[in-house]
Amino acid sequence: KVLLAKTLQANCPTLVQNDRKINLVNAYHPVLFLTNKQQGQKTIPFQCQFDSRNRIMVISGPNAGGKSITLKTIGLLQIMLQCGLFITAHPKSEMSIIQNIFGDIGDNQSIEDGLSTYSSRLLKMKYFLQHADSNSLFLIDEFGTGSDPDMGGALAEVILNKLNEKQSIGVVTTHFTNLKLLANHQEGIFNACMLFNSKSLKPLYQLQLGEPGSSFTFEVANKTGLDKELIQAAKGKLSKEKVKMDKLLNQLQLEKNNLEKLKR
């Protein structure tokens, strides 16, 4: 354990016994850290905090921006702690022991059982709802995908609300607008996004708490050289409210990038 801690540059967090708390300071995925170290690359850490008032984090943003690795890191560090290992985060981090840890990550399609990806995911959601409580942590990657976006998004919203009612702690990654809106007004649920350079259209791999992120779908399509008429036609298929919201998120990201440059 000591050798592993030294190799990973891991530390012992403060253990909170009388409260449910996950307060990670400069956390990073241990496997990503080792991979980047071998390649001479820097690993960008993140910070996040969960407590009785802010229990469920909804992470949005573009593909390949770091949403899934952030979710996996939070879950892995919790498991490392409960296995008696130091965690890859600053020693000022605070954590508590959690009784139940649930995860829905990756493609769960089963040929043997005749289950589609979405059916398999729904079975997991059913299990979560049956067993989750105030001493539970759930991790759901790409929540609601695998079905019709409107219907899948609506079902994901009511499931998330129910898990919130159970006072569970959780991390969800999504592209669904309705989940971002839910996190913006529902007590107990909060937004977070992976930062993205809106000019170069490259991910910054930084977690920003308190606001949703754009998926930059049309911007990426434009940069890849997809016909502009096709992009405009696709925009025309969306409601004006969705297009307006995505533009506002893009503009907010641009302003943040400019502000960061001024600070330097």
Question: At which residue positions do the language-model features occur?
Answer:
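ATPase nucleotide-binding head domains, primarily ABC-like/P-loop NTPase cores
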Residues: 6-262
